Amino acid sequence: MTLRSALDDYKRTRNDARVFPGERRSTTGTFSGLDERLVYVDRDGWHRDYSYPLSGLGGVNRSRFGVESLDGTLWVEDFETLSQDYVGDTALVKTVHDAGDFTVTQHDLTLGAVHLTRLELVGEFTTEPTLHAFFDLTPEQQESRLGKLEHEDTIEIHHDRQHNLVTASTGLDDVFGQLPEQFGELVSATDTVSYPRSQSGGSKYEDALLNGTVVLEIPFDVEDTGTETVATTTVASLLFDTDDTARQAGLDAVAEAAVAHDTVAALREAATDQVDVTVPDDTPRRDLAVEDLRVLSLLAADTGAHIAGPDPDPFYVYTGGYGYTWFRDDSEIARYLLEADERLGIGLDDWLDRSAAFYMDTQLDDGSWPHRVWA
């Protein structure tokens, strides 16, 4: 969450007795990302990055998906959400929405630094549907002084070193820049801003270009079965640092990821391959073991450390921060895993080795550990 979006949320929720104004809430959906990126997928269809503590990369701050119709844009958040579940033992998230005349089946999967959202619409349409995708992208956690580049079928938002890319398996029909919250809107006690805006720019040419807000018009791959219409597309976003990845390599990678995962079967296969520990079928209360290991994988860094949780308070207004490894908590987790593995034989040797190496690397000269560290 950036300062602009935090102020907007504060004005919307400051009189709500049940929430903390300005926080990044993640209580109604679920998470994907067993590698370097951690992405929250809400039941309303939008997603947001919680990746910075794990990878040092800033990603999606806000997003929305909608379907263009003759009556305007129908936003997924306004549909009835029928279900949201993980697929099997994986971190592939399946969400089903009912839009009345059609249903939307959404699959979300985070692989490495790529997040994939596949949308499948099935039903009756008065006109060929188009996807509207709004993104507020924040490379290096920045919300201003950003560059926006349009490639043939990819939008690029960049700051200094970090670049965020978005594309779709079906390409992009159009790209519209968005005017960020203006000073008068920010300081107003009541005015809130909803995206996407109707206008695409400000009084100056650069107003809609030097920030990370953008709307994409994305065509669907449409098939008429005779009894119903099926429309599909896969939207992919990639975060990368030019110190590690060249721009062209990033452009190639995000395009290949979108096309390679444009079917449910491909997503399921990739999600299954991503799980590095398979819980034996005869494990007592296996479903609980799978859920616990999935949560720990979501919170794990490459170092073997675990952050306390997806950080809801990036400005440290209400807490001391969840995007850290707290040694007391992490060591207890490692001990419980060791005891559970000794009893159940799940096969967590690699996990435990990474934890031990992390403790050795961070131990101080006097034999103690700091209170907390970045993962």
Residue map of PLM features:
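Helix-terminus loop motifs that line ligand-binding clefts
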Residues: 300-314, 342-375
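Conserved oxyanion/phosphate-binding beta-strand-loop segments in alpha/beta enzyme cores
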Residues: 277-318
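The feature captures the catalytic groove of carbohydrate-active enzymes
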Residues: 231-253, 309-326, 371-375
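Alpha-helical packing segments of well-folded alpha/beta enzyme cores
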Residues: 115-117, 288, 329, 355
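Generic, well-ordered alpha-helical scaffold segments in large soluble proteins
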Residues: 291, 295-299, 336-337, 358, ...
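Well-ordered alpha-helical segments within folded domains of soluble proteins
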Residues: 323-341, 345, 349-353
